[in-house]
């Protein structure tokens, strides 16, 4: 049975990301999600390479470990709902991903290149040129990725897939995607202390003017954005 609250939260996050053009914060990757079973030329990948694909409204990153294996930090709501590894190891759908972002649950897991890419085109080591940082040796990059496998808390701003790969590749956790998302949101929300006030005002507007009020969406979105931006 579907949970209406999780369904609504998933839809809200998706709309927020669309509004902020989050997908445009990194390079546009053509062909995203056009065919989950498409073949990939994995012989061109080297252990320790950073792989980059377009996934839902995010640019998703992973570290190639060799032998058709990719380590990547992946939000997944199922991690909060079950300990059944057979279920959680299945390919993470876009809805599972979005709900995992909302609930801040994730793991650093290993998938095949095909499952990681989810039908999108793959860019290799594109961050090297974007960030203009000196990368570590590829074997060290892969070793760092392997050492971090397992459950991890998720934060859109402080611990996402880009933070994971930049730590492995360059030795420091940075995420231009997250920084640009934060810059967009803070134009509207300047102080986290406004969360309680906005929630109270939003509740009052809903009570007195009804759910159809034009004030309802901001009343819900502002506290929700603050929740997602918290560590």
Curated annotation (Swiss-Prot):
Upregulation: LRAT activity is up-regulated by dietary vitamin A. Under conditions of vitamin A depletion, LRAT expression in the liver is induced by retinoic acid.
Entry EC no(s): 2.3.1.135
Lumenal topological intervals: 216-231
Protein family (similarity comment): Belongs to the H-rev107 family.
Catalysed conversion reaction: all-trans-retinol--[retinol-binding protein] + a 1,2-diacyl-sn-glycero-3-phosphocholine = apo--[retinol-binding protein] + an all-trans-retinyl ester + a 2-acyl-sn-glycero-3-phosphocholine; 1,2-diheptanoyl-sn-glycero-3-phosphocholine + all-trans-retinol--[retinol-binding protein] = all-trans-retinyl heptanoate + 2-heptanoyl-sn-glycero-3-phosphocholine + apo--[retinol-binding protein]; 1,2-dioctanoyl-sn-glycero-3-phosphocholine + all-trans-retinol--[retinol-binding protein] = 2-octanoyl-sn-glycero-3-phosphocholine + all-trans-retinyl octanoate + apo--[retinol-binding protein]; all-trans-retinol--[retinol-binding protein] + 1,2-dihexadecanoyl-sn-glycero-3-phosphocholine = apo--[retinol-binding protein] + all-trans-retinyl hexadecanoate + 2-hexadecanoyl-sn-glycero-3-phosphocholine
Metabolic or biological pathway, per its Swiss-Prot or TrEMBL entry: Cofactor metabolism; retinol metabolism
Ways its activity is controlled: Inhibited by all-trans-retinyl alpha-bromoacetate and N-boc-L-biocytinyl-11-aminoundecane chloro-methyl ketone (BACMK).
Membrane topology summary: Single-pass membrane protein
Phenotypic consequence of gene deletion: Knockout mice are viable. Knockout mice at one month of age show loss of nearly all cone photoreceptors in the central and ventral retina. Surviving cone cells show severe degeneration, the dorsal retinal also exhibits a significant reduction in cone photoreceptors. At one month of age rod photoreceptors show shorter outer segments. Nearly all cone photoreceptors are lost by six months of age. Remaining cone cells show disrupted structures with the majority showing abnormal cell bodies or lack of an outer segment.
Matching InterPro entries: LRAT (IPR042288), LRAT_dom (IPR007053)
One MF annotation (Gene Ontology) recorded for this entry: O-palmitoyltransferase activity
Cellular localization per UniProt: Endoplasmic reticulum membrane; Rough endoplasmic reticulum; Endosome, Multivesicular body; Cytoplasm, Perinuclear region
Topological domains, Cytoplasmic: 1-194
Domain LRAT: 50-177
Residues of the active site: 60, 72, 161
Protein name: Lecithin retinol acyltransferase
Entry's transmembrane regions: 195-215
Entry GO terms, CC: endoplasmic reticulum; endoplasmic reticulum membrane; multivesicular body; perinuclear region of cytoplasm; rough endoplasmic reticulum
Keywords assigned: Acyltransferase, Cytoplasm, Endoplasmic reticulum, Endosome, Lipid metabolism, Membrane, Sensory transduction, Transferase, Transmembrane, Transmembrane helix, Vision
GO biological process, one term: lipid storage
Tissue: Hepatic stellate cells and endothelial cells (at protein level).
Entry function: Transfers the acyl group from the sn-1 position of phosphatidylcholine to all-trans retinol, producing all-trans retinyl esters. Retinyl esters are storage forms of vitamin A. LRAT plays a critical role in vision. It provides the all-trans retinyl ester substrates for the isomerohydrolase which processes the esters into 11-cis-retinol in the retinal pigment epithelium; due to a membrane-associated alcohol dehydrogenase, 11 cis-retinol is oxidized and converted into 11-cis-retinaldehyde which is the chromophore for rhodopsin and the cone photopigments.
């Amino acid at each position: 049975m579907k949970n209406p609250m999780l369904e609504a939260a998933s839809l809200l996050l998706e709309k927020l990301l669309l509004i902020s053009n989050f997908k445009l914060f990194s390079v546009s990757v053509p062909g995203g999600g056009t065919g989950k079973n498409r073949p990939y030329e994995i012989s061109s990948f080297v252990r320790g390479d950073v792989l980059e694909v377009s996934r839902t409204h995010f640019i998703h990153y992973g570290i190639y470990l060799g032998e058709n294996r990719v380590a990547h930090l992946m939000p997944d709501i199922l991690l909060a709902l079950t300990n059944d590894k057979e279920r959680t190891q299945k390919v993470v759908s876009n809805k599972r991903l979005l709900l995992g972002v909302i609930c801040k649950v994730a793991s650093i897991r290993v998938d095949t290149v095909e499952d990681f890419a989810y039908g999108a085109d793959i860019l290799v080591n594109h961050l090297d040129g974007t960030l203009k940082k000196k990368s570590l040796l590829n074997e060290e990059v892969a070793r760092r990725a392997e050492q971090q496998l397992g459950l991890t808390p998720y934060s859109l701003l402080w611990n996402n897939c880009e933070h994971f790969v930049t730590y492995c590749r360059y030795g420091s956790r940075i995420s231009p995607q997250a920084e640009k998302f934060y810059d967009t949101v803070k134009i509207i929300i300047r102080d986290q202390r406004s969360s309680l006030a906005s929630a109270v005002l939003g509740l009052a507007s809903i009570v007195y003017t009804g759910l159809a009020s034009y004030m309802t969406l901001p009343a819900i979105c502002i506290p929700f954005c603050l929740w997602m931006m918290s560590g």
